[in-house]
Amino acid sequence: MDLSASRSDGGDPLRPASPRLRSPVSDGGDPLRPASPRLRSPVSDGGDPLRPASPRLRSPLGASRPVVGLTAYLEQVRTGVWDIPAGYLPADYFEGITMAGGVAVLLPPQPVDPESVGCVLDSLHALVITGGYDLDPAAYGQEPHPATDHPRPGRDAWEFALLRGALQRGMPVLGICRGTQVLNVALGGTLHQHLPDILGHSGHRAGNGVFTRLPVHTASGTRLAELIGESADVPCYHHQAIDQVGEGLVVSAVDVDGVIEALELPGDTFVLAVQWHPEKSLDDLRLFKALVDAASGYAGRQSQAEPR
């Protein structure tokens, strides 16, 4: 069966979402001292909390290295004598960012409101929507498959809100595995909930934490093709995949089964999502380096826009 679903191009990627999906700067002083009160809320003037704040609010860590936010898990975790809810992310993700020249900041799920989302995005120069458990199928109008993970509505809502805010700002975005699915669903797409039912094999997820390496082929003329060439062997661990493609997105890679392995938004803004796990191949930093370079450009544009 050909899974490379018809792409939608010409839709508005920033259109209002379905209601069910809504859900200090360094001045040379001590970077750990309390910020000036005027920096505490980018929406204190009653403006749009999702628009970029004044550039002087954008990077508490300085402008030399771009700040990249990575979404994270919020799960019950055992460590030492503790068995508690905790936010976490495998170290490979933020090592990819730091090795590529960025500063990584983790963004565990929290209650969503426009002010909190705006405050977070004001501190970032790029966003990574990371891998994790399956999206709630209700987000794309389906009932759950027996193999679909128990929903994490808090993480879903948090990532949808961050992603939509980042897209509105023109902020660079990289999606990884689940992050590809978040991007697709946020723009109106749907998912195959369990690939083995369609393909007749489990080659995309071997199980027990073992990553499968699969060849993918890129689409000529896409950003991804410019970055990695015509093909690559990539580490995969997913049992779900893109079905109908979200509005404005183009398919930039497929595998030998026709499964969509990458999506991107055309245009000047870096918005790229891969179904595989580049953090598991840190000897190849091309995707992370491209994101960090785009984040540096975003930071520079914000700095140039600052009133003199």
Curated annotation (Swiss-Prot):
Q: What's a GO biological-process term for it?
A: polyamine catabolic process
**Looking at its record, which EC class is this enzyme?**
transferase
| Annotated keywords | Glutamine amidotransferase, Isopeptide bond, Transferase, Ubl conjugation
Q: Spell out the molecular function terms from Gene Ontology.
A: gamma-glutamyl-gamma-aminobutyrate hydrolase activity; transferase activity
Where the record annotates domain Glutamine amidotransferase type-1, the positions are 78-301
Q: Might you give the EC number(s) for this enzyme?
A: 2.4.2.-
Ranges annotated as biased composition (Low complexity): 13-24, 31-42, 49-61
Region Disordered, as annotated, extends over 1-62
Q: Origin, by domain of life?
A: Bacteria
Cross-link (Isoglutamyl lysine isopeptide (Lys-Gln) (interchain with Q-Cter in protein Pup)) at residue(s): 289
Catalytic residues? 177, 277, 279
What is the protein named? Putative glutamine amidotransferase Rv2859c
Species of provenance? Mycobacterium tuberculosis (strain ATCC 25618 / H37Rv)
